[in-house]
Structures are given as structure tokens and as C-alpha cells.
Amino acid sequence: EDATFKGANVTADKIDFEIGGNLNVISLQDEYKLNGENKSGGINYGHTEQSDGKSYNSPSGNLSYGESKGDSKWVNNQTSIIAQNVGSIKVGETLTNVGAIIGSMNDSVRIEAKEVVVENLKDHDNGKGYNVGLSGVDRKNVVPQTELQYGSHDKEQDTNATFVNTVVIENGKEIN
């Protein structure tokens, strides 16, 4: 039978797996997409009576517009199978390690499989946003106050498939 560990963390003093079929150990990427827009505007109207009998009206207004966009595929918690001491993993068919950690904290773990597939994950987290605003236009201030905000981030990382303190045997031959 096959066994699959996705987004899991297995830790034991000793690991002794015998998998008749395939063993898949896969880290999961958290994903999100952001596509936002905001618009706002306002008009204020005030009427003031002064002590000398004069009065005046004071309309004012403001406008703002902004957009934000983002995209992320990121491993926050790498899947792992870790023996504190010794271990053995025998896989009848294919061992697939996708961005996960397999190994031991101390003594070596022996891993045997007909085929070993190793795949690293490319993670990214990108985003940007801006906002433009005009405000403070009134009878006394005909030139508006302006506001411009911009922010962005662009991160990348590799989540590597990793074997720690292991001897890996593929189809009878030790591999690195």
C-alpha cells in the first residue's frame, strides 16, 4: 500500500516504516491572491455666522482612490519525518520527497526504495498597493492637500527536499 504525508510533522524516537507501494512526503504551499480596490469621496458644507453679523458658507471636499494586488505561494511549515535516534524506511516502489525533510537528529536513518524522486519548491510572496487622495478644498484653501502612498514587497525562497543523517539506497545503489 501507499503512504502519503502532506503538511505533517512526524517525530519519534525510532522510525521503522515498511511501505509496500509508494511513499510521498510533500510540503504544502499556502496560497493567496489579492486584487482589491477602494474609492471614497465626501463633501462637507458649513455655514458660519460671525459676531459682526457677517456670514459665510464653506463647502469642502475630499476624494481618494487606491488599489492593491498580491500573489503568494509559500511553505510556512515544512513537512517532516524525523527520528530522534535511529530509523529505517523501506519503500517497495517510489519514495517522493517534495520540499520535505526526512532524517534523524542523531543516528543515521537507512532509506531504501526502487526509485527516489526529489523535488524542490519555489516559493514567492509578491504584492503592491497605492492610494491617492485629495482633500481640504474649501473657500479659503483652493489648492488641495494631496496624499500619495505606495508600498510593495517581493520575496522568494526555495524549500528544498532534504535528507538529514541518512543513507539513501535507490534500486540497490547508495546515492547522495
Which role fits each region the language model picked out?
Residues 1-176:
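Binding/recognition "hotspot" determinant
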